[in-house]
Amino acid sequence: MLAMEKEFDSKLVLQGNSSNGANVSRSKSFSFKAPQENFTSHDFEFGKIYGVGSYSKVVRAKKKETGTVYALKIMDKKFITKENKTAYVKLERIVLDQLEHPGIIKLYFTFQDTSSLYMALESCEGGELFDQITRKGRLSEDEARFYTAEVVDALEYIHSMGLIHRDIKPENLLLTSDGHIKIADFGSVKPMQDSQITVLPNAASDDKACTFVGTAAYVPPEVLNSSPATFGNDLWALGCTLYQMLSGTSPFKDASEWLIFQRIIARDIKFPNHFSEAARDLIDRLLDTEPSRRPGAGSEGYVALKRHPFFNGVDWKNLRSQTPPKLAPDPASQTASPERDDTHGSPWNLTHIGDSLATQNEGHSAPPTSSESSGSITRLASIDSFDSRWQQFLEPGESVLMISAVKKLQKITSKKVQLILTNKPKLIYVDPSKLVVKGNIIWSDNSNDLNVVVTSPSHFKICTPKKVLSFEDAKQRASVWKKAIETLQNR
């Protein structure tokens, strides 16, 4: 794995196949626009976490020498190797380097150390579209039209390059500080046979275009039926995303992935009464079970999609110069000082990155003491009353920081459990009727051991190197769980 970035040399050789299946060798070389630099983590000051994935984190990072702020994607080499994700990482890097469009996130440079790979991406200070939907409850039709038009404009370019994104959703639609959309996260991208993107022979997302990737709520029925991927996959996800903008929730939301898939296959979709006729019609067409009938995928291509009545009044030639909708601020930022630099806030345990990154931050902000951290977690955490029944599951000296009745979701079923976060640190889930421990998660000082991903206000996933556990909190406190666990990690 140490040689991974070395393969991203300034010159690449591509072995290609002809469309008729005969093996034809062809050479193609190009220079990377985003170079591999000799930077180290010590060259940056780290701030808040933008997002967490199964093998990566994206964090706000300021380059000390220039003051430039990036969204630094930090990928765990060990996990990438173990989970056979090398090809995905290479392909994302190669694709981002070659895409040039105002609606697509930019890659500036890469570097690596002994434990991690780094991609310095454009920092979108407006956050995720998902956050705007959550803060506003739902978007107005004018807001949804503006954002959808910008996504359509970027998708048209992506598809013209012979690429399928395969993970279009509100979380992957980022907003600039002035409110324009940028499509991000090309970790699931699929080059088509006639793609204009140059790739390495060993940098392909998968050999079979029907391989399941993406996010359950946005997956089209043809993928569930193992049909090859097409541009129509992204258009289905666009329809789901537009529905979510206008309603506040995804169209096929259910208690488990299995139930979501059943609703997708059955096309079990209900339109709220407040949807306009034009919005309802566009979503209905984008969610056609036949991929080739979706607007944008047929013989007329994106011309048919852009002329749909929902987009009446959209100036397609000047999208990026139009005034975007006003962004709803992060409620947490309302209590912060306006002069506060995020780079010095939101302390993040970075001891797993580089050789001794924690040392470099000592001069910037002292980490909170154990008592301070425990106190802040306790204020966040004890959201359900604690009774003596749960004491039997604790070790001597161990205390409960957060506890709640939740559902543990599996593919087909869900089970009620009592989820307990302790100061060990440890997570325990208990069968509340039998008072039997069903499992526990203990993690070390390495924050890569455990990541929390919020998928909706009530749903969250706890990811470890060995497994991913999905939970539903009926009181919609998924973000509270995430904050409590991450605060404990950063103690």
UniProtKB/Swiss-Prot annotation:
It is a peripheral membrane protein. The active site is at 167 (proton acceptor). The modification Phosphothreonine is found at residue 211. It is an enzyme of class 2 (transferase). Phosphorylation on Thr-211 in the activation loop is required for full activity. PDK1 itself can autophosphorylate Thr-211, leading to its own activation. Transmembrane segments: none annotated. One of its GO terms (molecular function) is phosphatidic acid binding. Belongs to the protein kinase superfamily. AGC Ser/Thr protein kinase family. PDPK1 subfamily. PANTHER family: 3-PHOSPHOINOSITIDE-DEPENDENT PROTEIN KINASE 1-RELATED, SERINE/THREONINE-PROTEIN KINASE. This is 3-phosphoinositide-dependent protein kinase 1. It comes from Arabidopsis thaliana.
